[in-house]
Regions:
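Residues that mark the junctions of alpha-helical repeat units in TPR/alpha-solenoid scaffolds
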Residues: 2, 40, 74, 113-120, ...
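TPR-repeat structural position
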Residues: 19-20, 57, 91, 137, ...
């Protein structure tokens, strides 16, 4: 396999839920020197996803942090880190990485592929939920409104707003 073939083969193995084989080929790819940085970063993210499926979250985090040795942290990498903490109910750490991903958007130009929702909407919606769980309802409200501004067809906006309003007395707070 060429270096690039290793990467694409590993992605196919992932799509077919052959996770152990996927990791084997991702590791071969990552050890190669002649790879494009964005492919390396994407391979580390894919490795992390496999380890999350296997419920090996510390290894998943290490895969994501390894990307920092190649270049500045990517928005999608920071979101993946935040998601691991979010799914572990470690909302303070999730908040840190979601906010860091928002702040890193200014460095985004020409730094790989990014999902449209990762340009602020996803992070804002996730921050809303984090703050809601931490009972910081005004911050949850703020980020829900921001998510709505960024994507006004957001299906979560009204349910979130109604849930938050049940806990906030806007006149006395």
């Amino acid at each position: 396999f060429s270096t690039r073939d290793l990467y694409y083969y590993a992605r196919e193995l992932f799509r077919h839920q052959r996770y152990d084989d996927c990791l084997k080929y991702l590791n071969k790819f990552i050890k190669r020197k002649d790879k494009y940085i964005e492919d390396y970063i994407d391979a580390c993210i894919l490795q992390s996803k496999v380890y999350c499926i296997k419920k090996e979250y510390q290894i998943a985090l290490k895969c994501l942090f390894d990307t920092f040795t190649y270049d500045i942290p990517r928005v999608n990498t920071l979101i993946e880190i935040a998601n691991i903490y979010f799914n572990s109910y470690d909302f303070d750490k999730a908040i840190y990485y979601y906010k860091l991903s928002l702040n890193s958007l200014k460095y985004y130009k020409n730094k790989g592929f990014i999902y449209k929702d990762y340009l602020g909407y996803y992070q804002s919606l996730s921050l809303c939920v984090c703050y809601f769980y931490l009972k910081k309802y005004k911050k949850a409200f703020y980020y829900n409104e921001l998510a709505h501004k960024l994507k006004n067809d957001n299906p979560f906006y009204l349910p979130n707003k109604n849930a938050i309003n049940k806990y906030v007395n806007w006149k006395n707070d």
